[in-house]
Structures are given as structure tokens and as C-alpha cells.
């Protein structure tokens, strides 16, 4: 069961995202959700997932490298924005264009969503790969809760958005 504190933080993040859309004057925002990326440490994460060893010294190091991203899907482009996890604001106004990648739909060569097979009991989540000039990998988990990210992502899956 989620606590009120977590729900308030989530509501605050969702409001910050909506304010960000307004500041950036995005039009036609269809879907958005927050997800995780391992960046250059992805290979260690993959080895950890394949072996099922989550108690090694590598896992805590990878978790420190883990970054949260906001994926925004408009009719013309996909935007990838890094979200701060610590501090007063997750999307401060002074850094609207910082850590923002804009990918035109015509430049995207591939968009794949694959279920993550978990070796343990519980939901594994999904891996998202976007290939344009380079490949971007993300993961989304905890799809059983009613967070805005879980709701948006499940809606996109139901609509066949990634097919």
C-alpha cells in the first residue's frame, strides 16, 4: 500500500510535468511517463539480470548510477528529459532545455517495447529501446500501482502504440 507522502510526491511530480509542458509550449502531447535508464552501466545491469545475482557489489553501484527520465510522445517527436530525483523541484524552470533530447518521428528507426522476464516472483516490467542516431534504453516497473506513469504506459500498450 502506498503512503500519502509518496502519493503527494507523485502528484507534485505530475504537476511539475504539466507545468513543464506549458513552459515549453508542447503541442499535441499524447502520452508521457517516467522511466529509468542505466546509461553506460547498462551492460552490468544486463549481466546482473541474466545471472539473477542481485546481491553482488555491482548492484548497489548500478543503483547509484540509475537515472530517471521523462519520455514525452507528441505527434511529431519523442522527447527524452532527465528528471532530478533529489532537491526541491524535479523539473526546475532554469533547466528546461538542459538534459533534453528531441527525436523527430522521421529520424526514429526503431521503437521497441519488450517485457522484462523476472527470475523472481513479481512483475518484471518493460524495456523500451528507441533507435535514432543512437540507441536509448529505458525500463519501467511497478505497473500494478496507479501512478501516472503506470496508467499512461498501460494505456499506450492497450492502444497498440508501440506496435
Description of each model-found segment:
Residues 129-152:
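Canonical phosphoinositide-binding patch of PH/PH-like domains
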Residues 26, 37, 50, 85, ...:
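Intrinsically disordered, low-complexity segments enriched in small/polar residues
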Residues 1-76, 83:
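Anionic N-terminal interaction surfaces
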Residues 148-163:
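A membrane-cytosol interface segment of integral membrane proteins
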Residues 50-70, 75-125:
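Phosphoinositide-binding peripheral membrane targeting modules
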Residues 17, 21, 112-115, 157-161:
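Hydrophobic, Leu/Ile/Phe/Ala-enriched alpha-helical segments that form helix-helix packing faces
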Residues 23-27, 103-106, 161-163:
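Structural alpha-beta junctions
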Residues 37, 106-108, 116, 133-135, ...:
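Generic structural motif
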Amino acid at each position: 500500500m502506498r503512503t500519502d507522502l509518496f502519493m503527494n510526491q507523485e502528484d507534485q511530480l505530475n504537476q511539475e510535468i504539466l507545468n513543464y509542458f506549458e513552459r515549453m509550449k508542447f503541442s499535441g502531447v499524447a502520452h508521457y511517463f517516467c522511466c529509468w535508464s542505466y546509461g553506460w552501466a547498462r551492460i552490468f545491469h544486463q549481466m546482473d539480470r541474466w545471472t539473477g545475482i542481485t546481491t553482488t557489489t555491482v548492484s548497489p553501484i548500478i543503483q547509484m548510477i540509475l537515472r530517471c527520465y521523462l519520455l514525452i510522445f507528441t505527434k511529431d517527436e519523442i522527447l527524452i528529459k532527465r528528471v532530478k530525483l533529489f532537491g526541491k523541484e524535479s523539473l526546475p524552470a532554469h533547466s528546461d532545455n538542459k538534459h533534453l533530447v528531441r527525436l523527430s518521428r522521421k529520424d526514429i528507426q526503431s521503437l521497441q517495447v519488450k517485457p522484462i522476464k523476472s527470475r523472481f516472483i513479481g512483475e518484471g516490467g518493460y524495456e523500451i529501446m528507441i533507435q535514432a542516431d543512437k540507441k536509448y534504453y529505458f525500463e519501467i516497473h511497478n505497473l500494478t500501482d496507479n501512478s501516472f506513469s503506470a496508467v499512461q504506459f498501460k494505456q499506450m500498450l492497450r492502444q497498440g502504440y508501440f506496435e
